[in-house]
Amino acid sequence: MSDKLIRAIAKDGMIRIFATETTELVNEASKIHDCTPTAAAALGRMLTAGTMMGAMLKSDKEVVTLQINGGGMAKGVTVTAYSDCSVKGYIGNPHVDLPLNTENGKLNVGEAIGKNGGLTVIKDLGLKDPYVGQVPIYSGEIAEDLAYYFTASEQIPSAVALGVLVDRDHSIKKAGGFIIQLLPGADELLGDLLTYRLDEIPSLTTMLSEGKTIEEVIEFIFDGMDLKILEEETPKYKCDCSREKVERALLSIGYKDLKELYDEGKEEELKCHFCNKAYKFTKEDIGKLLEEKEKSIADEVSEEMKKAEEKEKNKK
């Protein structure tokens, strides 16, 4: 069964729903980053959340980035998502390995993430400055943290479920999630009814493991609530790195650091955080970048001198 994301509404548009199965996507990411089960669960939950938040974007020029770091052994997770339901991400420590949570017997994502930090959401909407929202970590389990973010930072009461079920061979057996939001004007009793229903249902990964599709999961939750599925898409893990982008990253470091790399004379290998693709740079390659950096600095100095001269002329 392939991955799928659906957008839906219920109760005459008073409830907005994003729901997705991301089993293949998370499995691919876990393989790319060589994740332990705990790391796969943490990264997978964030990727699933990112997929749905990307689907909330209005245009293909908009981008959303999620970052969570609570000081735990996972060393933070970063995910970037786009409006076409493509997503990429990485975890600081893909080999974090912890005992199961003693309270529920599940992978201990909360401890891996930690609680001494925050969840940050950065939305680049094509404006001069990006929107940045940040909340302290609520539990480190990610779903609860994201629900807290929506309520506290965007003032949208939301229920969030994120699940990753890892098989014995460390492959991803099932992964998925949903974000259910009460829109302005919704009756308080509707929120109470929704809370009651969500408290009574099995976990999302349990339902997916039983063979339910993501549509069937949502139909089960919203039975008798005038559910309307509006759109279906296929989420995918996609990295858009390129040699040109890596070169720009090298050019962005200080002149002194770039000169040191050149003087060392060694071949440098830089890896993309998101897909682990390696880009190699010879001394000659770095020399060309150094020349470009020197020209850029010279142009900046020349421009500043022109401005200073113009200023002096205006004084006279």
Curated annotation (Swiss-Prot):
Predominantly, its location class is cytoplasm
Query: Which terms are listed as keywords in the entry?
Result: Chaperone, Cytoplasm, Disulfide bond, Redox-active center, Zinc
Q: What SUPFAM superfamilies does the record point to? A: Hsp33 domain (SSF64397), HSP33 redox switch-like (SSF118352)
Cellular component terms (Gene Ontology):
cytoplasm
Cystine pairs annotated here are C239-C241, C272-C275
User: Which GO BP terms sit in this record?
Assistant: protein refolding
Q: Which Pfam families match?
A: HSP33
User: In which compartments does the protein localize?
Assistant: Cytoplasm
Q: How is it modified after translation?
A: Under oxidizing conditions two disulfide bonds are formed involving the reactive cysteines. Under reducing conditions zinc is bound to the reactive cysteines and the protein is inactive.
Q: Has UniProt tagged this entry with the keyword Chaperone? A: yes
UniProt KW Cytoplasm keyword = yes
User: What Gene3D superfamilies does the record point to?
Assistant: Hsp33 domain, HSP33 redox switch-like
Q: What is an example of a GO molecular function annotated in this UniProt entry?
A: protein folding chaperone
Q: Which family does it belong to?
A: Belongs to the HSP33 family.
According to its UniProt entry, the function of this protein is described as: Redox regulated molecular chaperone. Protects both thermally unfolding and oxidatively damaged proteins from irreversible aggregation. Plays an important role in the bacterial defense system toward oxidative stress.
Quote the protein name from its UniProt record.
Answer: 33 kDa chaperonin
Q: What organism is listed for this UniProt entry?
A: Clostridium perfringens (strain SM101 / Type A)
